[in-house]
């Protein structure tokens, strides 16, 4: 699916009732090389929300990040995740935002990045974000939450914050 194209996205959602939105554009794109990843996130989310509305989807589940109480402390990454959430919610299709800490387990992109770094680098100077607090959640737990959320009207138009009760940094 070409999410840059509204018509392609609309066609891809034809016949669907529910959608799990996992799109995130941290890597630069050759299609939008003048913009930032935040610009790309918003463009793709807007196309997706418009296509979902056009196809009368019943529900979108979006995976974002746990947000600090003070919006002035949002990192660029978390601000982009929140703006993506708001963009998806800007249309008529109900959205459930599941805001999670790092998802731990095989197949999770954050987990895979950290694992590759630790395997390839005997010593690493840790960037500032390594001190950021997080409430990790296991991939199986996350999948159960997603499964229970999809199509559940009680969760429409809501945000759920999920993660471990223990707050850890990436350094921990």
What annotation goes with each model-predicted range?
Residues 23, 61-65, 99-101, 163:
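Active-site beta-alpha turn of Rossmann-fold NAD(P)-dependent dehydrogenases/reductases
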Residues 64, 86-107, 113-116, 120, ...:
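Conserved beta-loop-beta element that borders a ligand/cofactor-binding pocket
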Residues 101-107, 128-139, 160-166:
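Glycine-rich "substrate-gating" loop/helix at the edge of Rossmann-like oxidoreductase active sites
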Residues 1-55, 66-73:
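NAD(P)H-binding glycine-rich loop region in Rossmannoid oxidoreductase-like domains
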Residues 37-45, 61, 81, 135:
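Short alpha-helix in the Rossmann-fold core of NAD(P)-dependent oxidoreductases
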Residues 148-172:
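Mid/C-terminal beta-alpha module of Rossmann-like enzyme folds, strongest
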Residues 42-48, 80-91:
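Conserved catalytic Lys-bearing alpha helix of Rossmann-like short-chain dehydrogenase/reductases
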